């Protein structure tokens, strides 16, 4: 040691160019701050014929951006963590499954487990960095883990070097369809993403515990994107060319947020594309794959129910997409008032024995509510259902009263004595139901009511 110190003093007095020699030592990870003279062979450090460089007593710089292969060979575990890359497994492999395979070969000192994730959707790329606590564990992983089967795939284990990282990254891009990493490729084109950024131990990366699996929080099939608002839908929505098929979600721009697995795991039974009715909302959220397994998100005003209507007349009605929240509340308030008033008037008329006017009032209220722009909403259906229940009750009461025959004959005589009122009522209904299809539906319902009435009268007389 003393001879090494004398050499340092002599070279320092002669103003030896230590900067150029120190630049060559940047590529070598030193064991400690001070090296002995025996650890300085000139043929290992420099290819030049100059005398061996002196040993600096100041701390050596960290090899941040030098070749990891040389660092891994020289340093051992002193300035670099003991880590390997484990890859070639399926994207749905969990951290627990990987740890179990590692423990099966006798390695129990796993310190950290980092999955390489797709920047766009958080899906696993099929390889991970495994950090262990000892170099012996690294040797075991490199010797015993390759060839182990994990979810039907033989895992590949390599030292944690930048070159191996690039190889695993290239394999991941081949395993994922082009749609899955189209956003990644665009990011790398403008210099914002490189393979090393996806999986490099750095302070900028937020380390997650092994139990956190971001790509498992994304639905791999028709589940909606729970955490995201629905995508903006420009009105009017484009309708599908085939009848009975829901229109595709217009203007969807979140396809890159949805995990498009190249193949589905055996424990997730997912039907083929197109076999799932409108859902997401898979969502929305995060996420339906871009291969059309997810239908349009449910609309507040049942906008998607129009193509499913069995009556062709419903398609010509007003589009609910133009109804704002305030307008919807106003229409619902008016419908509630109509329903309440019609029920009160019908009950009052039925109590007075005027069943004909009560039935006419309820039928008119039902027709008006059905014609409103929010008729397909569940709350409107509740109003219509209550009106129909009241109508059936009044009809049943009128039939029971008419069993004696007097009430029925009185009702017929009343209609014969006042044909003007019947014509006025019919004209009023035609004005309310100016739509031809709704007009037909209304009178079909009236005809069915009269047919039921005639059948009951006939059965009563027999």
Curated annotation (Swiss-Prot):
<dbReference type="GO" id="GO:0110104">
    <property type="term" value="P:mRNA alternative polyadenylation"/>
</dbReference>
<keyword id="KW-0597">Phosphoprotein</keyword>
<feature type="modified residue" description="Phosphoserine">
    <location>
        <position position="414"/>
    </location>
</feature>
<feature type="region of interest" description="Disordered">
    <location>
        <begin position="161"/>
        <end position="213"/>
    </location>
</feature>
<dbReference type="GO" id="GO:0005847">
    <property type="term" value="C:mRNA cleavage and polyadenylation specificity factor complex"/>
</dbReference>
<feature type="region of interest" description="Disordered">
    <location>
        <begin position="400"/>
        <end position="462"/>
    </location>
</feature>
<dbReference type="InterPro" id="IPR000504">
    <property type="entry name" value="RRM_dom"/>
</dbReference>
<dbReference type="InterPro" id="IPR034772">
    <property type="entry name" value="CPSF6/7"/>
</dbReference>
<comment type="similarity">
    <text>Belongs to the RRM CPSF6/7 family.</text>
</comment>
<keyword id="KW-0963">Cytoplasm</keyword>
<keyword id="KW-1017">Isopeptide bond</keyword>
<dbReference type="GO" id="GO:0005849">
    <property type="term" value="C:mRNA cleavage factor complex"/>
</dbReference>
<dbReference type="Pfam" id="PF00076">
    <property type="entry name" value="RRM_1"/>
</dbReference>
<keyword id="KW-0694">RNA-binding</keyword>
<dbReference type="GO" id="GO:0005634">
    <property type="term" value="C:nucleus"/>
</dbReference>
<dbReference type="GO" id="GO:0005737">
    <property type="term" value="C:cytoplasm"/>
</dbReference>
<feature type="compositionally biased region" description="Basic and acidic residues">
    <location>
        <begin position="432"/>
        <end position="462"/>
    </location>
</feature>
<keyword id="KW-0832">Ubl conjugation</keyword>
<feature type="modified residue" description="Phosphothreonine">
    <location>
        <position position="194"/>
    </location>
</feature>
<keyword id="KW-0539">Nucleus</keyword>
<feature type="compositionally biased region" description="Pro residues">
    <location>
        <begin position="50"/>
        <end position="62"/>
    </location>
</feature>
<dbReference type="GO" id="GO:0003729">
    <property type="term" value="F:mRNA binding"/>
</dbReference>
<feature type="modified residue" description="Phosphoserine">
    <location>
        <position position="404"/>
    </location>
</feature>
<dbReference type="InterPro" id="IPR035979">
    <property type="entry name" value="RBD_domain_sf"/>
</dbReference>
<dbReference type="GO" id="GO:0051290">
    <property type="term" value="P:protein heterotetramerization"/>
</dbReference>
<protein>
    <recommendedName>
        <fullName>Cleavage and polyadenylation specificity factor subunit 7</fullName>
    </recommendedName>
</protein>
<feature type="region of interest" description="Disordered">
    <location>
        <begin position="34"/>
        <end position="68"/>
    </location>
</feature>
<dbReference type="InterPro" id="IPR012677">
    <property type="entry name" value="Nucleotide-bd_a/b_plait_sf"/>
</dbReference>
<feature type="cross-link" description="Glycyl lysine isopeptide (Lys-Gly) (interchain with G-Cter in SUMO2)">
    <location>
        <position position="345"/>
    </location>
</feature>
<feature type="compositionally biased region" description="Basic and acidic residues">
    <location>
        <begin position="416"/>
        <end position="425"/>
    </location>
</feature>
<dbReference type="InterPro" id="IPR034773">
    <property type="entry name" value="CPSF7_RRM"/>
</dbReference>
<keyword id="KW-0507">mRNA processing</keyword>
<feature type="domain" description="RRM">
    <location>
        <begin position="82"/>
        <end position="162"/>
    </location>
</feature>
<dbReference type="GO" id="GO:0031124">
    <property type="term" value="P:mRNA 3'-end processing"/>
</dbReference>
<feature type="compositionally biased region" description="Basic and acidic residues">
    <location>
        <begin position="181"/>
        <end position="190"/>
    </location>
</feature>
<comment type="function">
    <text>Component of the cleavage factor Im (CFIm) complex that functions as an activator of the pre-mRNA 3'-end cleavage and polyadenylation processing required for the maturation of pre-mRNA into functional mRNAs. CFIm contributes to the recruitment of multiprotein complexes on specific sequences on the pre-mRNA 3'-end, so called cleavage and polyadenylation signals (pA signals). Most pre-mRNAs contain multiple pA signals, resulting in alternative cleavage and polyadenylation (APA) producing mRNAs with variable 3'-end formation.</text>
</comment>
<feature type="region of interest" description="Arg/Ser-rich domain">
    <location>
        <begin position="409"/>
        <end position="460"/>
    </location>
</feature>
<comment type="subunit">
    <text>Component of the cleavage factor Im (CFIm) complex which is a heterotetramer composed of two subunits of NUDT21/CPSF5 and two subunits of CPSF6 or CPSF7 or a heterodimer of CPSF6 and CPSF7. The cleavage factor Im (CFIm) complex associates with the CPSF and CSTF complexes to promote the assembly of the core mRNA 3'-processing machinery. Interacts with NUDT21/CPSF5.</text>
</comment>
<feature type="modified residue" description="Phosphoserine">
    <location>
        <position position="196"/>
    </location>
</feature>
<dbReference type="GO" id="GO:0051262">
    <property type="term" value="P:protein tetramerization"/>
</dbReference>
<dbReference type="GO" id="GO:0180010">
    <property type="term" value="P:co-transcriptional mRNA 3'-end processing, cleavage and polyadenylation pathway"/>
</dbReference>
